[in-house]
A protein has these predicted regions:
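TPR/TPR-like (Sel1-like) alpha-helical repeat modules
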Residues: 81-108, 114
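Structural signature of tandem alpha-helical TPR/SEL1-like repeats
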Residues: 17-30, 52-64, 86-98
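TPR-adjacent "capping" and linker segments in tetratricopeptide-repeat scaffold/adaptor proteins
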Residues: 1-7
Length: 117
């Protein structure tokens, strides 16, 4: 039986929730290849890459998620964190400032922005 993007996405989410980010990457890459313009898939794949230490790949996926959905505060946050991890503090500031502006109550967003400044 051929896997649909939704099935692969659900599998990836389950694996990520069960602390199996490497396995989640495989499922989520399959979902992304089937539905490359789904922001939720791109964001979740970014989270999986981040949790496996693949920060450049994570920033690429979070960036694409933001292109698809510019008001996705979590994708902006993930993009900023990923850029911080690859040493791009100046590049991290803009997405983190936007994430904080959208969700000022999120301590993690404000903390990450402080780290970037």
């Amino acid at each position: 039986m051929e896997s649909t993007a939704y099935d692969a996405f659900q599998e990836g989410c389950r694996l990520l929730a069960n602390a199996s980010p490497h396995a989640a990457v495989v499922a989520l890459e399959r979902a992304r290849d089937l539905e490359p313009d789904k922001g939720s898939i791109r964001e979740t794949l970014g989270r999986a890459y981040f949790r496996t230490g693949r920060f450049a790949a994570a920033s690429s996926e979070f960036s694409r998620a933001v292109e698809i959905d510019p008001v996705n505060d979590y994708a902006l946050f993930g993009l900023g964190l990923s850029l911080l991890r690859v040493g791009d503090r100046s590049g991290a500031r803009r997405p983190l400032k936007l994430a904080v502006a959208m969700r000022p109550e999120m301590d993690a967003y404000r903390d990450a922005l402080s780290d970037a400044e």
